[in-house]
Amino acid sequence: MLASYASDPLKSRGRLYKEIPTSYRNEFECDRDRIINTNAFRRLQYKTQVFINHEGDHYRNRLTHSLEVSTVARSVANTLNLSSDLAETIALAHDLGHTPFGHAGERALNECMKEYSGFSHNAQSLKILTLLEKRYAAYNGVNLTWEVLEGIIKHNGPITGEINEYIAEYNKQNDLELSTYASAEAQIASLADDISYISHDLEDSIGAKIIDFNSLAELKYIDQHVFELKSKFKNISSSCLIYEVVRKLMHELITDLLWQTKENLNKEKIINIYEIRHLNYQIVDFTEKTNDRIKETKKFLHERVYKSNKITAISLKCTKIVQGLFKVYMDDINLLPVNWKMLIDSDDTYSKARVIADYIAGMTDRFAIQEYNQLCSLNFNNILKLNYEYI
């Protein structure tokens, strides 16, 4: 039974374009299915989490990460008697707007777009789901419920100060109450993202030999798990050891999140979702001790993994690809597919830049590499191939 402060699908604020609900799914289950069936969701399997897609079959990509986040979000929401369907759905959609090549790709595209109001993957997720996906005859986008869109756009909390152009534009027709906190389910999805990525980036980084178990001594609380497991299982393999460490880490983080959130709910005597949205802090949270550990772990990953020689070298190449593609399309829009070129307002540089950014952001790693090799290479064979495939 849902708590009184849960997001009840029967009491949803509905969709921008009115629809008759189905009898066999609730509104949030319907949204989950719509997201899974988008082209953008399928493309996530070929988009970088930390390691480029072709570097290894077992490294996580944006799709596997999103699935892992959704399982954590669903479990936490279910334990708190919240809508597990809503938490799962928001988690599945939270990375849809990411560029190829992960954060390196986003930084590169944002730099290209600095004269055209920049680029934000969070705003791009909203744009994909409300405009760019073309699946229905009656409207653009996939017409999700208010609660799902709110949860996606407030992934990092209330939006104050300068508001992204597309978010502001969409908000005029469907007010997402940007200045308030999102539902408890959306807050769960956000912290499930933190739990998943810090745990699994550690695992993948050890698998890629960017860091080793000795490096984890910098993180005392994780090193303690390593020590205990080695003491208990004398001949444990390295691969099994990191799996067990990640398992313990995730259990600790989830247990802590549940405990602190229950404390917050009881302290505030929350009885409805309105109170959650209008608190002056996020109701779903870790303890202060665990928040400090998460910050420490993020700093460790940033310094030892994301800024490592291997990742930095790859990031430089990825930056070159994104910026190179942006330049060639800006120089000649005829290199764009016809259906994308038609979206550009004639002789409007701003419109051209925005359409090109949308096109590049939707690329997978491998398509961006292929496109760069064909459009930015002087190899004569690529020029001949270009004539057949793109003109």
From Swiss-Prot:
GO MF term list: dGTPase activity
Keywords assigned: Hydrolase
PROSITE patterns named among the record's database cross-references: HD
The organism's place on the tree of life at top rank: Bacteria
PANTHER family recorded: DEOXYGUANOSINETRIPHOSPHATE TRIPHOSPHOHYDROLASE-LIKE PROTEIN, DEOXYNUCLEOSIDE TRIPHOSPHATE TRIPHOSPHOHYDROLASE
Similarity section: Belongs to the dGTPase family. Type 2 subfamily.
Protein name, as recorded: Deoxyguanosinetriphosphate triphosphohydrolase-like protein
Upper taxonomic lineage: Bacteria, Pseudomonadati, Pseudomonadota, Alphaproteobacteria, Rickettsiales
